[in-house]
């Protein structure tokens, strides 16, 4: 399994952060779920710093790399709509994975 970690900054307030999260739920995730190899999505927020970390998980490195063109566009569009910027995008091999996440 492989992961792509994206750091966004520039969320001016809670409203812009909530708008971003809504865009992800309504527009980004439906597209990403359809990409072969997609295995998961986590968004971590820090309202005080106006930052979001997004981790997408992929079944293989090849599938993660193949998703780049689509995900670059989605990232840019979502950030632009809320006045945020993409600070960095990094790729990793997942060494350990254990998720048991309750909604909320």
Where are these regions (language model features)?
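Short S/T/G/P-rich N-terminal loop/turn motif that feeds into the first structured element of a domain
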Residues: 1-52, 59-72, 80-104
């Amino acid at each position: 399994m492989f992961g792509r970690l994206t750091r966004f900054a520039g969320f001016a307030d809670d409203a812009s952060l909530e708008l971003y999260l809504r865009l992800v739920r309504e527009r980004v995730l439906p597209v990403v779920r359809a990409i072969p190899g997609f295995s998961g999505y986590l968004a971590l927020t820090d309202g005080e710093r106006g930052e979001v970390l997004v981790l997408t998980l992929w079944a293989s490195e090849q599938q993660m790399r193949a998703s780049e063109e689509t995900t670059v566009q989605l990232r840019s569009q979502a950030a632009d709509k809320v006045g945020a910027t993409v600070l960095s995008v990094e790729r990793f091999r997942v060494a350990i994975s254990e998720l048991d996440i309750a909604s909320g």
